[in-house]
């Protein structure tokens, strides 16, 4: 399963990338706002840093305008993935852009039917939002499993990119289900290393080692 970083924080992306943890990056208008930077500037910097797909999102509502914005964003770097919303106009834009050979990430997916339409439109990635479904007492992970099954049933090549990842359990369950990709904030990815028993084990080892009176570097 590939790990994408859901962030426009170049320093945070670079830290994870140095460990080989970054297979791609996803951004959106909210993350660009949080970065406080120009979208073209920060996106270009991320593309220079990361070899994998970097999603940059259109903001237009109409298909023709989305297509023009998508083409403009795609000029930034060869690894740009144009992100479009899962609306009828977004699907129209997806079809045109993928026919032109561009990667497209169809975002804000909340149902199997939407995922089917995106795959039929040739989407490179479909982004179902787990956390936002959980917020309204629906099962976001169940949607990931359902899309995985449907795509496998019909051999769709669209990759399932699980988004709105908020917890380590979301990541573990997506891996079990067979999501192709998860995208998560840097803090969530770093948090995957944490476990209470690891902490307790280290405390015990540190206490026992202190009792030996030794230091490894002085041996």
From Swiss-Prot:
Q: Which reaction does it catalyse?
A: D-sedoheptulose 7-phosphate + D-glyceraldehyde 3-phosphate = D-erythrose 4-phosphate + beta-D-fructose 6-phosphate
Cellular component aspect of the GO annotation: cytoplasm
Copy the pathway line from the protein's UniProt record.
Carbohydrate degradation; pentose phosphate pathway; D-glyceraldehyde 3-phosphate and beta-D-fructose 6-phosphate from D-ribose 5-phosphate and D-xylulose 5-phosphate (non-oxidative stage): step 2/3
- Keywords for this entry? Cytoplasm, Pentose shunt, Schiff base, Transferase
Q: What is its subcellular localisation?
A: Cytoplasm
Gene3D superfamilies from the entry? Answer: Aldolase class I
- Under which EC number(s) is this enzyme classified? 2.2.1.2
Pfam families from the UniProt entry: TAL_FSA
One GO BP annotation of this record? pentose-phosphate shunt
Enzyme class name: transferase
Q: Which residues form the active site?
A: 83
Disulphide-bonded residues: none
Molecular function terms from GO: aldehyde-lyase activity; transaldolase activity
The record's listing under SUPFAM superfamilies reads: Aldolase (SSF51569)
Q: What does this protein do?
A: Transaldolase is important for the balance of metabolites in the pentose-phosphate pathway.
The similarity comment for this entry is:
Belongs to the transaldolase family. Type 3B subfamily.
Q: Which HAMAP family match?
A: Transaldolase_3b (MF_00494)
The record's annotation in NCBIfam families points to: fsa_talC_mipB (TIGR00875)
Q: This protein is called what? A: Probable transaldolase
